[in-house]
Regions:
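Short S/T/G/P-rich N-terminal loop/turn motif that feeds into the first structured element of a domain
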Residues: 26-230, 234-261
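Bacterial Sec-dependent N-terminal signal peptides
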Residues: 1-28
């Protein structure tokens, strides 16, 4: 049992270090990916850890959980206002972690719950992304109440690799779409992010909507407006001929409302 307690303590300390912070929105997103053969076993223990952490710090953790459609892959997402705050979190964890572990130690059957989670869960690691505000449209979302934000349950995630045209060509094309959308009255929620450390993609675009059905309908409406514009068509044909990026992967993610902290 002592060995199990030490393993559990180390895991909890590491997890709390990753996911405790007290900022409502930031320039950096930490995205932790894991697969679960048994969501109930995984999330029961994780829910205990995060709920206890929230109780200890006395504030919302501003963390949300998503599940990839038709998959056992999950993503835990939280934000930092700056890289310095990411570093400062390590210092805060020295005080928070022992309190969290002490409270969890008193939970009935905690060893069994932890071992069940450990057996069911395969962690894939964390990625840190920087938001590029000038290539994003998140202000309307940030102005919403927490209840309004919960209505936006769907995320379309597109991972891009750059072509030989280079980064400036990719960003110039993104800027063209943004400017064109403003002229055409096209408005939707999206965030363009760049990995802080090297990953399997150069950029990540996240599009927000209330459901996958709403996303596809709104996407179709947007494209109809865009293709009605001569300048947009000319740029589209140019990029089709000489691409500035290629799609590495696309995800359809749904918010798990019961696991918001």
């Amino acid at each position: 049992i002592c060995v199990n307690q030490n393993i559990m303590k180390k895991f909890i300390y590491t997890t709390v270090l990753f996911f405790t912070a007290f900022y409502s929105f930031g320039q950096y997103f930490l995205i932790y990916e894991f697969e679960s053969e048994n969501q109930s076993d995984t999330m029961e223990m994780f829910d205990l850890m995060m709920s206890t952490t929230k109780e200890v710090v006395g504030k919302d953790l501003n963390m949300v959980t998503f599940q990839k459609e038709l998959s056992n892959t999950h993503f835990l997402v939280r934000t930092y206002a700056s890289l310095q705050e990411w570093v400062d979190e390590d210092k805060a964890s020295e005080e928070i972690n022992p309190q969290v572990f002490q409270k969890l130690s008193g939970v009935e059957n905690i060893q069994e719950k932890f071992l069940a989670m450990q057996k069911a869960t395969d962690g894939k690691g964390a990625r840190l992304f920087e938001l590029l505000p000038e290539y994003s449209n998140m202000s309307p979302y940030l102005a919403m109440s927490n209840e309004e934000k919960k209505e936006y349950k769907y995320r379309r995630v597109v991972l891009y690799d750059l072509t030989d045209a280079g980064e400036q060509a990719f960003l110039a094309n993104q800027k063209f779409w943004i400017d064109s959308d403003k002229e055409l009255g096209v408005d939707y929620l999206y965030a363009l992010m760049k990995p802080v450390f090297a990953t399997d993609a150069d950029y990540m675009l996240v599009l927000l909507d209330k459901s996958r059905f709403d996303y596809h309908k709104n996407w179709s409406d947007r494209m109809d407006k865009r293709f009605s514009d001569e300048d947009f068509n000319a740029n589209y044909e140019k990029i089709e001929k000489d691409p500035v990026s290629s799609v590495v992967e696309e995800w359809n993610l749904n918010l798990l409302e019961e696991f918001i902290y």
